[in-house]
Amino acid sequence: MASSRPGAGFDGAVARGPPRRYSKKSALNEIMKARKWLAAKALVVAVTSCLSMIPAMAYRKAQSTARSVPTLEGGRAEFNAHVSEWLKESDVPSVAVAYIRDRKVAWTEVYGEQSPGVAATHHTLYNMASLTKPITAETILRLASAKKLSLDESISKIWIDPDITDDPYSKLLTPRLCLSHQTGFANWRRMTGGVLKIRWKPGTQTGYSGEGYNYVGAFAERKLARPFDALAQETVLDPIGMKETSYTAKDWYSGRLAVPHGPKAEKPIDPIATKWNAADLLRTTIGDYAKFVVSVMRDEGLTAAIAAERATITRDTVKPEDMEKACREAGELSQCTVTAGMGLGWEVEVVNGVKILNHDGSDWGVRTLAMFVPSQGIGVVVFTNGENGMRVIRKVVEALYPNKLYAATI
């Protein structure tokens, strides 16, 4: 979620919404939370490619009766029958789902209500929360592939945030370090007293940061003399055909927004960006984001080298003792290797040689997820407008990519 300090350090270029709710207030805890999240997700992934085209519940049913595995269509019917009960038991108003097979959108579906009494549709616009970041990253990577900027040039030659003008570490900041969360910034500057600070030498540690994404967005905007959201439109959204996606409020938002749903005792928070935010608040439909994931899976618009770098772990965050524990729980003691860390725009996990790219998003009353397995051409995208949305997302992912351990760590 965006900083609560309007326009701090970005000359008003970035929309700032209400503060995100945190159970841990310190910047250190925020870093550790992000690291543990990355490691925990990667530690338990197991790939089941032969079962990835059917729902898990259909698979279990087939196993117990010794009958043949149902077709995708048969399994999907059973999947549809369960979604409404998942929404009800989790107190989540709606969920939008996309399933990708063979690097193509196999199907999309939307269930529930976008707002009280209004059914969600394929045109419902969901807040992406941090799923905004992969689109921002793809914009920068395509600009780099077109040689309009370099991933390794010093941002300081173009622009320095006023808060860090006197910090010599500011000269070390590059687009690559911003996209891989190695800037040394806190997630949001409100976590460091409302002032942007570099807490360690850039490139030496991983620390999840929305500020880093806004920093590289501001750099691209100044270097290319174009608003960042216009660059994203021209470089990513238009070429892919994402006609229902925007960083900022549009007239066509009217009547189409998925209203966030949180604890009943709390007043709803639903910030609408009036100026671009490279890390949060992008609005889109399930169909548009599914097309985006397919484009990423096909490496469209990128050089081969940059495509490879996007899917390469910059720093392994998995401790040996954690890997041993996860392998024991998964029953894979004899042959089990796990690495995980940030790529460029995505979290990258490699389990027993199989690579998975994924990212999630979390704002007040909003939970989102996108994941894909490049080697298998499989992907799943899920949006919800409920505080408990991850409960539904876990069930959806387990059904479409049937691995209970992976789904349980989301």
Residue ranges with predicted function:
Residues S3-S4, S23-S26, S49:
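Serine residues within intrinsically disordered or low-complexity segments
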Residues G12-A15, R20-R21:
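Short, low-complexity intrinsically disordered segments enriched in A/P/G/S/L with frequent Arg
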Residues K33-V44:
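N-terminal Sec-pathway targeting helices
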Residues V44-S52:
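Bacterial N-terminal signal peptides
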Residues P55-E109, E221-R226, A230-E234, D238, ...:
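Catalytic loop of the DD-peptidase/beta-lactamase superfamily, centered on the K-T-G motif
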Residues H122, N127-L131, L143-A186, R190, ...:
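Active-site helix/loop module of the DD-peptidase/beta-lactamase fold
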